[in-house]
Curated annotation (Swiss-Prot):
It holds the Pfam family DUF484. Gene3D superfamilies: 3.30.450.40. Transmembrane segments: none annotated. This is Uncharacterized protein YigA. It comes from Shigella flexneri.
Amino acid sequence: MKQPGEELQETLTELDDRAVVDYLIKNPEFFIRNARAVEAIRVPHPVRGTISLVEWHMARARNHIHVLEENMALLMEQAIANEGLFYRLLYLQRSLTAASSLDDMLMRFHRWARDLGLAGASLRLFPDRWRLGAPSNHTHLALSRQSFEPLRIQRLGQEQHYLGPLNGPELLVVLPEAKAVGSVAMSMLGSDADLGVVLFTSRDASHYQQGQGTQLLHEIALMLPELLERWIERV
């Protein structure tokens, strides 16, 4: 427990510090009038013992510049990454828009994924949101919401995207004809995440992992429904 004298000394120190700071702020010419005294002030240093006030200030300035440089480098990296994502998305959108049929669009989508080094890309749609039944030939895209729900709860939870492996029974639900799937990037379609699922597959089990960026995946999941409406009527 601190003695009354110690508490009083701490209070006086705090008041003295505050008074000094207030005085220097109000009287900036102090440093001009007392230039030699300022140069003689020594500041504690963890390595060198003490350094001059000027050296201490310059070190702080260098550290500040270093932080600014690191932040600028990070911003540049993010800008370059975002530019790359933008052009990939723009190329995909133009390619899918130029499709002459739904099958052509799906093939272009699959080819785009292959060009990125993936095994492929697939779409599955919920029949209660799209007219997929006869007489259309789109029934192969249908995904039972009831069958998908356990997988959604297990892998996505409250999220819109999942990156990682799927087990055998799960693959049979979303990709019954797929072979040698090591990992997937899966996203719910539409702004309300209730129209279906888009999946990118890789043979590499470690290619897609939780924690990876999902910006491109998110943008594709928002873009596809409007393109699909050219060929499939919404319910």
